[in-house]
């Protein structure tokens, strides 16, 4: 919002909500979703809901990470599934083309696929920032997760960033990457 204020842009509204329960009567010219769809599974229902938030000529921009070909759920089926349990509970790794099958209420206007090398670099940068600010972050984690869990969560986030760095850099960034979609009203 600071950037918006600096540029005298006043028609931006940031909403952070649980989309399972979210309702709003207000209509928007554009809706932007950043890394939310990975945490959802019923894309048909979600896109219907978002279409109701849009003006007649409105558009939806979606930024998600994706696999080039495979869609798979994040399932918590045991101790080894810590990432599914702690970071993506109930979510799914979508394939790049998965959203193309959900055009009942909104239709695809444009699709982009970005190499995973970008997210690899981003994950490494976040890891460095985290390591450089360990003391501050441990304090935040104490407030968030409790005294006994702060260091555990610090390590979980470190492993998360390392895992993402490796995953998105795998095979020169061609398998896992970032997908962008612009949907418009039907």
Language-model segments: residues:
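Conserved hydrophobic residues forming the short capping helix/wall of the S-adenosyl-L-methionine
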Residues: 1-4
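Conserved SAM-binding strand-loop segment of SAM-dependent methyltransferases
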Residues: 6-21
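A short acidic, Gly/Pro-enriched loop at the edge of an enzyme's catalytic core
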Residues: 20-31
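A short beta-strand submotif of the Rossmann-like class I SAM-dependent methyltransferase core
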Residues: 33-36
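Alpha/beta-hydrolase-fold catalytic nucleophile elbow
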Residues: 63
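Substrate-binding/catalytic lobe of Class I Rossmann-like enzymes that use SAM or dcSAM, i.e.
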Residues: 66, 70-178, 184-186
């Amino acid at each position: 919002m600071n950037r918006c204020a600096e540029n005298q842009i006043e028609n931006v509204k940031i909403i952070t909500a649980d989309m399972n329960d979210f309702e709003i009567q207000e209509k928007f010219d554009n809706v932007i979703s950043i890394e939310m769809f990975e945490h959802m599974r019923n894309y048909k229902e979600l896109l219907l809901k978002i279409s109701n938030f849009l003006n007649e000529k409105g558009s939806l921009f979606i930024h998600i990470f994706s696999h080039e070909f495979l869609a798979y759920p994040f399932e918590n089926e045991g101790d080894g599934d810590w990432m599914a349990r702690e970071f993506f509970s109930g979510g799914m790794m979508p394939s790049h083309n998965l959203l193309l099958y959900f055009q009942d209420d909104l239709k695809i206007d444009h699709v982009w696929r970005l190499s995973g090398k970008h997210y690899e670099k981003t994950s490494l940068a976040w890891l460095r920032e985290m390591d450089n600010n360990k003391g501050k972050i441990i304090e935040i984690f104490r407030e968030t997760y409790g005294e006994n869990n702060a260091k555990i969560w610090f390590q979980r986030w470190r492993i998360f960033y390392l895992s993402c760095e490796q995953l998105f850099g795998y095979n020169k960034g061609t398998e896992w990457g970032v997908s962008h979609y612009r949907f418009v009203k039907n």
